[in-house]
A protein has these predicted regions:
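Short glycine-rich anion-binding loops that position phosphate/pyrophosphate groups of nucleotides
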Residues: 73-75, 147-151
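Anionic-ligand binding region
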Residues: 116, 121-133
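Generic preference for hydrophobic
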Residues: 55, 69, 92, 198-200
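Residue-level preference for the first positions of well-ordered beta-strands
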Residues: 66-68, 139-145
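A cross-family acyltransferase "interaction/gating" segment
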Residues: 103-106, 141-143, 152-216
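Membrane-interfacial terminal anchoring regions of lipid-handling membrane enzymes
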Residues: 1-26, 37, 59-62, 137, ...
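Catalytic core of membrane glycerolipid acyltransferases/transacylases, capturing the structured
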Residues: 14-29, 33-35, 48-49, 61-121
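Short gly/ser/thr-rich secondary-structure transition/capping motifs
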Residues: 48-56, 125-126, 180-183
Length: 221
């Protein structure tokens, strides 16, 4: 019964947020400040899943400038856990297929996020170039999942290098975000599903790193 209630509530909540969000974003489409706003709204669903989310971040985190945030990508619950710590103006880089999710895909695009075609290496490299150019033009940060896919309980997967190439090319720091494990932890028929810690670590400077040191930088993160 609890499972059914949660599913119905979450579906209705998400549809309402996405529909009203799309209408709201039409007044300032592709504004990167929207991502944090709606990320936090989705983050409010964490208690519905029986989760208590504890945010940890450096005292000066609000004053960070342009950066690339990298986080571990576990499953769909990242949307109600990691989203709570997103800071404006930060946009995410997601797979192009997200656009086809009803309501959510349209909101994802209107809030200013970048879509990448992972099956086309040329277009993927073009997206990285777009990230670098965006840093040069305005105050903005990017959120990436360097594993490239959801780990689904397999631990931290090997990092792909796109985020690190972009950070070095743009000369911006990398800010790691760590989310404690949620895989095989959440039972939708259970009232309480425990504590999830989302921790933002201090920035890692990329100045001094060259293209031939990508793996060294990734290992440091």
């Amino acid at each position: 019964m609890l499972f059914i209630f949660r599913v119905i509530f979450v579906v209705i909540y998400c549809i309402v947020v996405c529909v009203l969000g799309c209408l709201y974003c039409l007044f300032s489409p592709r504004n990167p400040k929207h991502v944090a706003t709606f990320g936090h709204l989705f983050g409010r669903l964490s208690p519905v899943f029986g989760l208590k989310v504890e945010l940890r971040k450096p005292a000066d985190a609000e004053s960070y400038g342009n950066a690339i945030y990298i986080a571990n990508h576990q499953n769909n619950y990242d949307m109600v856990t990691a989203s709570n710590i997103v800071q404006a103006p930060t946009v995410t880089v997601g797979k192009k297929s997200l656009l086809w999710i009803p309501f959510f895909g349209q909101l994802y695009w209107l809030t200013g996020n970048l879509l990448i075609d992972r099956n086309n290496r040329t277009k993927a490299h073009g997206t990285i170039a777009e990230v670098v150019n965006a840093f040069k033009k305005r105050k903005i940060s990017f959120w990436m999942f360097p594993e490239g896919t959801r780990s689904r309980g397999r631990g931290l997967l090997p990092f792909k290098t796109g985020a690190f190439h972009a950070a070095i090319a743009a000369g911006v720091p990398i800010i790691p975000v760590c989310v404690s494990g949620t895989s095989n932890k959440i039972n939708l028929n259970r009232l309480k599903n425990g504590l999830v810690i989302v921790e933002m670590l201090p920035p890692i400077e990329t100045t001094g790193y060259g293209k031939d040191q990508i793996r060294e930088l990734a290992a440091r993160c």
